[in-house]
Amino acid sequence: MGTSVSNPTAILQTMQGFLRKWWSEFNLQTRLMAAATLVVSLLMSGLTFWAVNTIQEDAQLVDTRFGRDVGLLLAANVAPMIADKNLTEVARFSSRFYENTSNIRYMIYADPSGKIFFGIPYSEETVQNSLTLERRIELPQIDPHNFDQPFVRQHHTPNGDVTDVFIPLQYQGKFLGVLAIGINPNPAAVNSSNLTRDVTIAVFISIWVMVILGAVFNALTITQPIKELLLGVKNIAAGNFKQRITLPFGGELGELIVNFNEMAERLERYEAQNIEELTAEKAKLDTLVSTIADGAMLVDTNLQLLLVNPTARRLFAWENKPIIGENLLENLPPEITAQLTQPLRELAADQGSLLFSPGHGPQEEEQDKTYAPEEFRISLTQPFPRTIRLMLTQVLDQNRENLRGIVMTVQDITREVELNEAKSQFISNVSHELRTPLFNIKSFIETLSEFGEDLSEVERKEFLETANHETDRLSRLVNDVLDLSKLESSKIYQLDAVDLYQLIEQSLRSYQLNAKDKQLQLEKILDPDLPFALGNYDLLLQVMTNLIGNSFKFTKAGGKIIVRAYPLHRSNLRAEDGPGLVRVEISDTGIGIDPEDQAAIFERFYRVENRVHTLEGTGLGLSIVKNIIAKHQSQIHLVSEVGVGTTFWFDLAVYQSMLMVVG
């Protein structure tokens, strides 16, 4: 019970609060106008209701008089018939009277005891059941002594309002009963009842409509232009120079609008010029930043990323990551974060007076406030080993007093480090290779020069052969360097028919004696239908010599070296491979190549010998092979397993009576 009472109370309080808040949002002028409109509308609606209601009451009075007159007329005519008990004539007369008078709804005759003996338009059965009919019509109790004047009343039925007229039936001073007549109300009176409501509501609404229309007209003619001007001024102040006022007004207000639009147009042109200049400068900067080979990042003083160029995204695998706005230290690899956290935080803390120099500590520099970048070299292990160089530089404002951010440039110097290491190794190898033959040559020549007369002919000849051998070794080293230089240049080589039988025979012939000395088995497996290949004989001979020489170098005594050559069948070829290919393979049962060396074995200066502790060769042989095969529009491949052996193979196009020149 308490809940049912409190809920309406709470709802009422909520509505009151809402109305109070809604009313408080209007200004004083609007409140006064609304109050005045409400008073006038209520006053006019009340006057209208009173006037129309008076008309309705007059119409009801007319209906009452009409019903009484009709009842008296009918009673005067039927009373003699009832006195004579001529009910047939009563029925005939009453029916004719009922049919000719449209306003009569029913006619009922009752005797002095109140029993109904005739009624129109009721059936005989209904009339006989006078109790039912009496209840339906609601006949009054009849008192003959006090009932000498017509009695009029109105009551409501499901079919509408009815005016009931009860007339006493008297003849020659004798009370014969009661005549009840139901009169339909005047349609004008019924309509006037609805008209009262409609006109009252219409007057109330019309007053509010006129007031609202007046307010709208006032807003459109005066208030709206002022609001538009106010909004335009706010937009101009906010930097929106595209704001225009398009209201069609003349006079002083129209002139004010025109002047405002001209001012906005001039400001927009000025802004467009500035934006165009800024956009051009920004485009230049974006182009420069996006095209430089180094990675570049800009962070604010909170170390939040503001700009990252494509190179930096690629270096740190940020291509598909929304990195702008993220914290730099949270997204760098752990190795970089460990070294840069402290320096970045010191720079971000506005160490404005510090000049950082690579390899030196901070130095005071108050005169020109220029800042040298601090350099870091960091080795990464994920996702693959590499070395990067990072440089941190402060970004100051125009007066070079306040810190605005930090620029970090990133360089992937992995290749540079590898080349430096390879060159250092190469120089070491070449120095050793050059020093040994030169020392030997010098030693033997000095011996011959000083003790030549004391040496036998055989000894002098042996010394000269050794010096000659060392000279060949020195020439071979120099030739390797020169060959690689030529291959990497744009020199043009002519390709023609190459007899692979002859090429392989000549390559193996030069190693026959060495194979015997080292107890190695040399074997060739050549297809009997081996076609001529398209290539350069001298270059391919150098390829075979280098590959077979490598197999000799890394194959132990008792091992085997096999050279195969065979045409590839059509089922092994793709449509883009051309008319046909010949495959050449050099296999050995040597020590094999470790998988981590296989990816870099064709690089310049790379030497597997470093891992097996044999400082023979220059590290250029396989690089020369790779370049020569590339000149033949092909690639060198290898398959190797440590402790099992290695197979190098490449494909050559079949010669088709054509002459090609390649560069």
Swiss-Prot record:
EC class of the enzyme, as a word: transferase
Residues of the Histidine kinase domain: 429-656
Subcellular location: Cell membrane
Reaction equation(s) it catalyzes: ATP + protein L-histidine = ADP + protein N-phospho-L-histidine
Domain HAMP residue range list: 220-272
EC number of this enzyme: 2.7.13.3
Residues annotated as transmembrane: 32-52, 165-185, 199-219
Topology of the protein relative to the lipid bilayer: Multi-pass membrane protein
Keyword set, alphabetical order: ATP-binding, Cell membrane, Herbicide resistance, Kinase, Membrane, Nucleotide-binding, Phosphoprotein, Transferase, Transmembrane, Transmembrane helix, Two-component regulatory system
BP terms from Gene Ontology: regulation of DNA-templated transcription; response to herbicide
Modified residue annotations for Phosphohistidine: H432
Cellular component, GO annotation: plasma membrane
Coiled-coil positions: none
Chain ranges of the PAS domain: 281-351
SMART domains per UniProt: HAMP, HATPase_c, HisKA, PAS
Keyword presence, Calcium: no
One function term, GO molecular function aspect: ATP binding
CDD domains, per database record: HAMP, HisKA, PAS
Domain of life: Bacteria
Note: Mutations in dspA results in resistance to herbicides difunon, diuron and calmodulin antagonists chlorpromazine and trifluoperazine.
The protein's name: Drug sensory protein A
Organism listed in the record: Synechocystis sp. (strain ATCC 27184 / PCC 6803 / Kazusa)
Lineage: Bacteria, Bacillati, Cyanobacteriota, Cyanophyceae, Synechococcales
